[in-house]
Amino acid sequence: MEIFDYDNILLLPRKCRVESRSECDTSVELGERRFRLPVVPANMKTVVDEKICTWLAQNGYFYVMHRFDLDNVQFVKDMHAQGCFASISLGVKQPDYDTVDRFVAEGICPEYITIDIAHGHADSVKNMITYLKAKIPAAFVIAGNVGTPEAVIDLENWGADATKVGIGPGKVCITKLKTGFGTGGWQLSALKWCARVATKPIIADGGIRSHGDIAKSVRFGATMVMVGSLFAGHEESPGKTVEVDGELYKEYYGSASDFNKGEYKHVEGKRILEPIKGKLADTLTEMEQDIQSSISYSGGKKLMDIRKVNYVILGGDNAGEHLLM
């Protein structure tokens, strides 16, 4: 098995077949909807809030609302009232089951539900998927997070419509340091490994440090890429604004950090400060243009043409050119 990550992989270009990069289509289908980009902001309190999710939905982007200090039922009602699709997060505890029961009682169905726990290959996730499929079968269920082919196979067999791959590769995640487990440092390899057995979409979650990493994720099997740090630190971001030596920053912390939990218990996340980057819309436009460029380098016109390219591994035992596999 090849072990590599984003920083030691480069994709190999093929003959360009478009007159302009603007001809390239970056859109992707997930469930019954098509979205402008294969990118979704991380469902974290310092990355998304109700206002940002509404704007994303209204402008053709996918989103997943976080599950912390939120009335999910009211959120879904509010999104539907504005003509937007609803995409929420659930855990696997009793209050999450109570939320599902409220959806049923009020005749409400969120279009997307992400079962979002740190170690998603678990009986507790199996039970929640089963419950969701029985109670609100129309919802598209994303389950995670996982990092092995066995986990992807199980989640799909349990009824998940998509899986979220990535255990601890994120910028504010310290799972590998605290536990000795995870995909940090080899997230791209883990994605490739999992994609080989997947029959349903994969959302690659974590480890993205540049826009080129999005193309690499698509090449190795991702339908959608969840991004935290690149979306944190915008003017609209919900994180607290902090001034340091005359420079403005936004707080960005992991969902399993003590800052998010409000207590120091089972902590696997940390807090950092992200320099304020400007407006979210400008970053999304730049992302779209960069992914269009990636598609043009792949010799194609559509996003999934990126999957047809070869790649090289830089350094290490697996260094050299790797033909399409």
UniProtKB/Swiss-Prot annotation:
Positions annotated as active site in the UniProt record: C173
PROSITE patterns (UniProt xref): IMP_DH_GMP_RED
Protein's UniProt keywords contain Manganese: no
Top class in the EC scheme: oxidoreductase
Keywords: NADP, Oxidoreductase
Any one GO molecular function term: GMP reductase activity
The enzyme's E.C. designation: 1.7.1.7
Gene3D superfamilies reported for this sequence: Aldolase class I (3.20.20.70)
Sequence similarity: Belongs to the IMPDH/GMPR family. GuaC type 2 subfamily.
Protein name per the record: GMP reductase
Organism of derivation: Acidovorax sp. (strain JS42)
